[in-house]
Amino acid sequence: MAIGLAYSTQAATVTHTITVNPTLTDWSVTNRVPQFDQRLGTLKSVQVTINANAAGRSEYVSLDRNWQLPVSLAVTNAVSARVGTLTASNSVTVSGASSVAYGVTNVETFAVSLGRAVSTNRNLGVFVGTNTLPVVTSATARTWYSGPGDFSLRWDTRASAVATVAYTFESNCDKDKDGDKDGDKDDDKDGGGR
């Protein structure tokens, strides 16, 4: 399992990114990201995002000469990213049905993309400080079969994911600029009155 961590800063936003390369499901990994440093300014909101790609295949073989009726297969892929009080999660189910002859290997493949973003501007205290926060990223696959007879069934499912934690804030630099502007106006008014 390969995991990557990245950090970027844009205007009034600090974003931490966690990447998990395609890995056999189920999996769950815990990484840590820094809390928001209040020396940068005042934290206004936090957003957690999860984007994932899941793919896999099933191999079904009928072992019963007396049956050639439709069989149904399904797989539900789910991903989530949890940090602090926020959890971003989503799931997608892929299903299909086919008639399978005795002794023939029936192969089905699937590929899905799924994601979710959640944010909050309340109770931000847990996200502020000089320590780190655990980010738990996970992916699961749940499979189902419905049909008659004896059979052999094998599933292979994998998922990759990118989780981000974004801090949006009012920077101290912006506050200083506003303060300077107000100060200049006061000076001009004082000067004009002399």
Predicted feature residues:
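Bacterial N-terminal signal peptides
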Residues: M1-G4
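N-terminal signal peptide c-region/cleavage motif recognized by signal peptidases
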Residues: A6-T9
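N-terminal segment immediately downstream of the Sec signal-peptide cleavage site
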Residues: A11-R65, T157-S160, T164-K175, G192-R194
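Solvent-exposed, conformationally flexible loop/turn segments
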Residues: A11-T13, T17-T30, S89, S95-S113
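Extended low-complexity, serine/threonine- and proline-enriched intrinsically disordered segments
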Residues: L63-S95, A163
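A short, structured loop/turn motif at beta-sheet edges
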Residues: A81-T87, R122-P134, F169-S171
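Cysteine-clustered segments with highest specificity for TGF-beta superfamily mature ligands
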Residues: S99-D156
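Asparagine/serine/threonine-enriched low-complexity, disordered tracts
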Residues: K175-K181, K185, K189
